């Protein structure tokens, strides 16, 4: 029986990449999106790509970050799926290589139990181009998942993970139910449930 569900945020619970929305404000959307794609496809180290992309955001007003973070388009079926999983007695958590400004706000809307992500450093109301947090490396999600499993007393067979990119691979290694959601090929290969349609409720039919 499944007891723990862990979802990625960008392009999984949310329809898009938070950092790409920030970059569009600075007119560098295409440049940042290209780096994001390289990282999600596994062609670029996640830590390096994160530093590079956040560095390009230096000078962006934090008020703009908050406004964008609070107006993101959530994935169809996200709220309903989380609600149903919780009704089935599962703990639902969000792991994101993105940012607390977005995952913290979405927690109250989508209803998951906790979020682990990164924090954009700001000074005098503007981004400094620096970032820190729980989810900065390729191994971060797998590392945090193992810690959560230990705390909750949950094993791999009782764990569901759902993501779309290469930085989700580490958590796929520690879960019995592995959902690749509109995912890159590198992640699909490791999944035992593959969903091609942007509708998270499809998970409910398969578990």
Description of each model-found segment:
Residues 69-207:
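C-terminal cap/substrate-recognition subdomain and adjoining C-terminal extension
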Residues 1-120, 198:
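Alpha-helical substrate-recognition element adjacent to the catalytic core
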């Amino acid at each position: 029986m499944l007891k723990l569900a862990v979802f990625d945020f960008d392009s999984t619970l949310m329809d898009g990449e938070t950092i790409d929305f920030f970059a569009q404000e600075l007119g560098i959307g295409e440049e940042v999106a290209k780096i994001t794609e390289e990282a999600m496809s596994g062609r670029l180290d996640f830590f390096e790509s994160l530093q590079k992309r956040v560095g390009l955001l230096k000078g962006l007003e934090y008020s703009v970050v908050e406004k964008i973070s609070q107006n993101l388009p959530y994935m169809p079926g996200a709220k309903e799926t989380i609600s149903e999983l919780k009704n089935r007695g599962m703990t639902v958590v969000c792991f994101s290589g993105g940012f607390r400004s977005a995952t913290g706000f979405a927690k109250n809307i989508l209803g998951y139990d906790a979020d682990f992500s990164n924090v954009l450093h700001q000074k005098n109301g503007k981004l400094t181009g620096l970032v820190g947090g729980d989810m900065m490396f390729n191994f971060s999600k797998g590392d945090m998942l193992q810690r959560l499993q230990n705390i909750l007393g949950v094993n791999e067979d009782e764990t569901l993970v759902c993501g779309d990119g290469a930085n989700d691979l580490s958590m796929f290694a520690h879960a019995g139910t592995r959902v690749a959601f509109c995912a890159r090929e590198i992640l699909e290969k490791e999944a035992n449930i593959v969903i091609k349609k942007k509708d998270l409720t499809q998970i409910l039919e398969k578990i």
